[in-house]
Amino acid sequence: MIKIFKPKNKFKDISIIELNKIIANKKRLGLLKIGNEKLGKLIWDFSLPPIESCPDCESCKLDCYAVRYYNQYPDVKKCYDDNYKLCLNDLKTFKQLLIEQINKRNNNKRTKNKIKNIRIHASGDFYNQEYLNTWIEISREFKNINFFAYSKAFSNIPNLPKNLNIINSFVTIDNNNYLNYGTYENISKMRAKIKGIICPVTIGKKIDCSACKYCITKNKVLFVQH
């Protein structure tokens, strides 16, 4: 069950004219973007505004790297904001546009970098059940594509498709929940207890998500504050 969350009106209450402009722009440019330096070139990303779309961000909003990135680059902010407005106001069209983008790229024989791995939310989270269900439907539509995400919005989601890996950002140790993000000292102790790994990118290793691929199928990953 998704945690109760009410999006702000500035994202939900928009005019038909603004919505149609967003749809036209997303249809032209695409909803999925090729990964940044951390994700690498083999992973595509769809993001929403940080904090504004996150049902449970009290434990991480002060140190959220996505907030800095979001506030630093106006084009990124507009992209994430428009994504959120589209999803809140016309989820059906969001799904349709995303499917069209994937099919168009993957069915083009001249295109080299096919969409094979999708990171859901380098920024943002699953803000309600209907939105989560839409991603589940999309992942079932493309069984040959890997989808992965991190979330604080729920404790458990049963019967997820095998190609959709959603990692709970809270780690349970001795019946207590801890955020899987923090100082190197704290994260090292947690890693030993859960027998997981520390994201190599966050400890300075020269590797990206496209090469690592741990989070695509596994869930015991921890992150050093960076």
Language-model segments: residues:
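Class I S-adenosyl-L-methionine
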Residues: 1-226
